[in-house]
Amino acid sequence: MWVSVEDDLFNSIYNKLKSNPIVQNELDGRVFDSVQKDAVYPYIVVGESNVTNNESSVSMTEDVGLTLHVYSQAVNAHETRELIKFLGLILNREIKLNNYEFIRSRIDDQQVITDIDQYTKHGIIRLLFKYRHTTKY
């Protein structure tokens, strides 16, 4: 039986952001796993994920898509764009995980929109990671 890399990758990215000195300085560590009610802006949400696996009798690889969101109420979208760019720079690279071999990562999509309240700037970046399993359970 193979155990998905999804949870380990999600937790690693979440913890990497929470402990990042730039996130600590600029956002006071405001990284969450869901949208916040009565939030202090800006903040980051490590959000939705999906997994596509390719299993054979002797190996397993997974493509994991992970979407991150940035919310800002700055006057313009510059802050949001800068934070999205920052997320791409620090996360679009190898993330070492026990029992999994990193193959590649890439930015699948990124965009900045204005939320329905017409004030909140919402940045979205979707990253794709490919891992090979090194352990079968």
Explain the meaning of each model-derived region.
Residues 1-16, 51-63, 101-137:
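Short, charged interaction patches at domain edges and termini
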Residues 1-50, 82, 89, 98, ...:
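Small/polar-rich, solvent-exposed N-terminal microdomains that initiate assembly or binding
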Residues 95-101:
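Short, flexible active-site-proximal loops enriched in glycine and acidic residues
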Residues 27-74, 106-111, 128:
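Short, solvent-exposed beta-alpha or beta-beta edge segments that form flexible loop/patches at the rim
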Residues 19-20, 93-94, 121:
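Polar helix-capping/helix-linker motif
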Residues 72-93:
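Mid-chain, well-packed structural core segment of small domains
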